[in-house]
Amino acid sequence: MLLPRMLEEVVLAVPARDYDRVVAGLAVEGIFHVDSPPQGVKGEVDRSYRALLTQASERSSRIRQYFDLAGVEPYRVSGVEIEVGGWGESWKRYLEKYSGVEKFYSGLLEEYSEAEARLKELLDIEARIAPVAHLDVDIARLYRSGAFDFAVYYGSYSEGLESRVGEIVSRVGGLAAVEASGGSVVVAVAVPKGALSKISPEILRLNLSIYTPPEGVPGSPREAMEYIRGEKARLGRRLVSIQEMASERLGELAEFYTVVTAFENIFKFLVSTLRRGETRIVRGFVDVRDSGRLRSIVDRMTRGSYVLLSLGVRRGGEAPIPSKVDLPQFLKPFSRVVELYGYPEPNEIVPTVFLAITLPLTFALMFPDAGQGLLVLLFSLFYLRRVSRDWAYVIAVMGGASVVSGLLAGEVFGPLVSKMLGLPELWYRLGLETPPYAMPTYAIDHGEEELVPVLVYRALNVSLFMGAFMLSFGTFLGVVNGVIKRDWVGLVESRLPRFLLFASITGPFLVYMDAGEAGSVLRQALLELGGDSIAAKLVLAGSVLGLAWMLLAGPIIYMLEGHSPLAGLANSFLEAYESLLMLVGNIPSFLRIMALALAHSSLMFVIYYLTVMIMQGGILADVVGALLYVGGNLAVAAMEGLLAFAHASRLHFYEWFSKFYSGTGVPYTPIKVEGVRIKIAGQTF
């Protein structure tokens, strides 16, 4: 769970007559990750399978578009049987079998794309017409006139515009009409043939733009807008109709997708296979737990006529190997977040377990409102779940965490609902002057302004504690990764001294959990050389030792390796400089936790007071105030929820992962056909 699984690298050689059965057996079991052919072994790859793999991959991608058209995630069905007499011939036969389904969805997708393109075109035309939409004149016809030049300009109105336009047009014996409305203006100009090109640059310099009648719509802007509205409505209905039609044959589409992805995986196996006479050779990786199963399957498929060469069991090394990550089911969705940064290497700690705790916690501290957290939770369960189950699970957990932090902050849809539910009184009954995570606006709302500095200070402590923990823990995990990778040089040169430096500086925030106390210790350590404080002296000693270690380790290691120590000194200087920059930049970066929490409570406080002010004018005012409060909650939940997720992810990716996690691994993807039985020569797998 904390480390990728140990994998065994094997080279498998089997007779050509048995190879199809071996491929089918291993694909059904899904335990063998096929890699590039073994180096140094003579043989050739059947290039025809590359073309078939390309076809299957393109088909698979296209089918996923068909699922998107129906508004559902791609899925496979079980119980599908593929009868194989030859992989290439069978592929063509099954394409023919499902050609009707493919033609149906291909036509729908083409029609949908055309309707979408037309809708986008109409929206662009609508935006162009909007400035002159009130004109009920066939402008396009006037533009085509052979007797005179005509043009319409639009823009922002400025004092004296009429006289300046009139002066410009009169010089060529033309006419101009200026219509101002609010801060906007429309100018129509008619001049003798050929004169427009002479005066148009001057008119454009008045901060006006020229209107060009779009093609394909009525020439009158007002009629064009009515036409566009009608077309938009018609196209909208057609798009909905196409999506409904796409849902009618999802069962057949899922079966087709199951077959196509099965062939796609089989072809991935075959393109990595070497042909050498009557022998087929393939190289790959298997989980050490499945080594026995692999040998048993191959032995059964070949009746003992095979050679399996083990190249060793390892977790990483010079040659790249895939990473197999095993996680409990309740943690797997969080791997989607980790994979946004990158996949773990086989010899580094998998951060998913830790992230599943720290990401919801960070999000909740930034977004402390039980009501809006509940909205996030419900949004995940009832909408996002249809788009992605994994992301719905992650967001639901984060929403649930916000429900808890909101209760601790005394916030449920802002102050108004919190008071209606009696949440502030609950904390009073528990013997607390304020809720444990109350924001400064809570004190202002309850007439306890003297508590504002206390609550700001409390939020500051929480932010700095989280930052200190994640930074020190991240550099510690960097040390652990160095040990796992046996990167002894990297450990001595950078990982250990960086951990010592970070632990020394962040330690006071963890020990005292008080920004003032921690700041006092750091001040004595850095400005008074420790003063009379033992803690400050420890901080100073750790910091100086960490920096000195970082600066000296490089030159010494370079010298021991027979290189110039000056090159090592330059590298060490950059390492020390980068570490100091991280310290200076990363710790304050965690103050965004406090900043977003304060911003959220302030927004809700403003909405609350506006609502209270409005709701003092009768029934209608009460309705308006209620709508404002509900709409404000929805807007803040959407905006602040997105911001909190973005900033929580940033703290993990840039401030935390950069200390220990590379994310440059390759996932272990065994060849696997899901929901498929393969029948070869009367034998079913």
Swiss-Prot record:
GO molecular function: ATPase binding; proton-transporting ATPase activity, rotational mechanism
Family that this chain belongs to: Belongs to the V-ATPase 116 kDa subunit family.
InterPro entries with a match to the protein in the record: V-ATPase_116kDa_su
Lineage: Archaea, Thermoproteota, Thermoprotei, Desulfurococcales, Desulfurococcaceae
Disulfide bonds listed in the record: none
Cellular compartment(s): Cell membrane
Membrane protein topology class: Multi-pass membrane protein
Protein's job: Component of the A-type ATP synthase that produces ATP from ADP in the presence of a proton gradient across the membrane.
Transmembrane domains' residue ranges: 172-192, 348-368, 394-414, 464-484, 538-558, 604-624, 626-646
Keywords per UniProt: Cell membrane, Hydrogen ion transport, Ion transport, Membrane, Transmembrane, Transmembrane helix, Transport
Top-rank lineage group of the source organism: Archaea
Quaternary structure (record): Has multiple subunits with at least A(3), B(3), C, D, E, F, H, I and proteolipid K(x).
GO biological process: vacuolar acidification
Cellular component GO terms, alphabetical: plasma membrane; proton-transporting V-type ATPase, V0 domain; vacuolar proton-transporting V-type ATPase complex
Name of the featured protein: A-type ATP synthase subunit I
